[in-house]
Amino acid sequence: MVVDLPRYLPLLLLLELWEPMYLLCSQPKGLSRAHWFEIQHIQTSRQPCNTAMRGVNNYTQHCKQINTFLHESFQNVAATCSLHNITCKNGRKNCHESAEPVKMTDCSHTGGAYPNCRYSSDKQYKFFIVACEHPKKEDPPYQLVPVHLDKIV
């Protein structure tokens, strides 16, 4: 059997791109969305990106390309969920913008393969937008909890 490679090339490329996108969007088994948000985005005191990202990458077993750490407590970020709703990038209306700018660090993958991922860091002081949902049984007992960092503004 001869495979018509040019005919199937777009499908092969799509499949090749799907795996990193799936990994980017998936949360580890056994974690609620709020707990995964906390692991990925909450860091009360600054750490070097190479150190901080190990805590994220150990769950997914790959080097996450870009990640932002908010230097705030989970409680303070969850308080943002009580502010007025705005539209998220995906069109849903469960996002909320922080009342004040916060310190944060953007970590960008510069090289290395898991588990030896290397990152550069960019310190910022900006507003953030989070998507919030009702908590699961294992989540902290807030009315709403952050589950996705939607945007930095």
From Swiss-Prot:
Keywords: Antibiotic, Antimicrobial, Disulfide bond, Endonuclease, Glycoprotein, Hydrolase, Lysosome, Nuclease, Secreted, Signal. GO terms for molecular function: endonuclease activity; nucleic acid binding. The active site is at 41 (proton acceptor), 148 (proton donor). The record marks 64 as: Critical for catalytic activity. It is found in: Secreted; Lysosome; Cytoplasmic granule. Its main location: secreted. InterPro entries: RNaseA (IPR001427), RNaseA-like_dom_sf (IPR036816), RNaseA_AS (IPR023411), RNaseA_domain (IPR023412). Induction: Up-regulated in bone marrow derived macrophages in response to the uropathogenic E.coli strain CFT073. One of its GO terms (biological process) is innate immune response. One of its GO terms (cellular component) is lysosome. Transmembrane segments: none annotated. PANTHER family: RIBONUCLEASE (PTHR11437), RIBONUCLEASE K6 (PTHR11437:SF4). Belongs to the pancreatic ribonuclease family. Ribonuclease which shows a preference for the pyrimidines uridine and cytosine. Has potent antibacterial activity against a range of Gram-positive and Gram-negative bacteria, including P.aeruginosa, A.baumanii, M.luteus, S.aureus, E.faecalis, E.faecium, S.saprophyticus and E.coli. Causes loss of bacterial membrane integrity, and also promotes agglutination of Gram-negative bacteria. Probably contributes to urinary tract sterility. Bactericidal activity is independent of RNase activity. This is Ribonuclease K6.
